[in-house]
């Protein structure tokens, strides 16, 4: 469907010359003299190439029809990452390139939001928080609690993060999926 360039926002998917692009940032620029323009920074979905385009605010762009649905992660194999729609039990496979670093946060049965275009997954949105167990960290040294120092730790998903000194091996913690940072001790 055709939309004005000025109405595009981060996360929208556009179709330019038969190729799909995801909008990374959209900025409306109003110069003192001349026509206002919209600056779009986009990434081509097929190969990950970043492009930057300028459109007059009156120009139209073809917005791709994208289906956003909740899917349950099943497993990973040589073909890619397999997800199932919990309503229709339909399964889709996403490539490792499309999943990227999100693979560290995928656990059996976790629910994610997949964006699909004509049945092919093009983007993934993880839950904001995830819980993992600390499998390796340095022992706490007495007297270190006065300062707010953090120590390195390895989680059960293989991710490295910084945790407070009172957390020990075997403790479950909650991390932010955007950057893998420690949020709190799990409440279970």
From Swiss-Prot:
A GO biological process held by the record: peptide biosynthetic process
Disulphide bridges, residue numbers: none
Biological pathway: Protein biosynthesis; polypeptide chain elongation
Cellular compartments per GO CC: cytoplasm
InterPro entries documented for this protein: Elong-fact-P_C, NA-bd_OB-fold, Rib_uL2_dom2, Transl_elong_fac_P/YeiP, Transl_elong_KOW-like, Transl_elong_P/YeiP_cen, Transl_elongation_fac_P, Translation_prot_SH3-like_sf
Entry annotated with the keyword rRNA-binding: no
Top-rank taxon: Bacteria
Job of this protein: Involved in peptide bond synthesis. Stimulates efficient translation and peptide-bond synthesis on native or reconstituted 70S ribosomes in vitro. Probably functions indirectly by altering the affinity of the ribosome for aminoacyl-tRNA, thus increasing their reactivity as acceptors for peptidyl transferase.
Homology family: Belongs to the elongation factor P family.
Identification of the protein by name: Elongation factor P
Organism (species): Phenylobacterium zucineum (strain HLK1)
